[in-house]
Amino acid sequence: MKQKTHKGTAKRVKITGSGKLRREQANRRHLLEGKPSKRTRRLKGTEDVAKADTKRIKRLLGKA
């Protein structure tokens, strides 16, 4: 039986052309008034997934 893609992970992680994994940063959804502008600016954009997690996440996405 084929392994299914883990949809929760698929919605959160994108694979680049070179095979790296990118994710959005946490702490930028709500309650932003109390956070300094410097912090919210720093949290913009995407970040590489930690090297320790890459293998496991690729397996969840069916790309291992």
Curated annotation (Swiss-Prot):
GO terms for cellular component: cytosolic large ribosomal subunit. Pfam families: Ribosomal_L35p (PF01632). Belongs to the bacterial ribosomal protein bL35 family. Residues 1-14 have a biased composition (Basic residues). Residues 1-50 are annotated as: Disordered. Keywords: Ribonucleoprotein, Ribosomal protein. Residues 21-36 have a biased composition (Basic and acidic residues). It comes from Corynebacterium diphtheriae (strain ATCC 700971 / NCTC 13129 / Biotype gravis). One of its GO terms (biological process) is translation. InterPro entries: Ribosomal_bL35, Ribosomal_bL35-like, Ribosomal_bL35_sf. This is Large ribosomal subunit protein bL35. GO terms for molecular function: structural constituent of ribosome. The keyword Ribonucleoprotein applies.
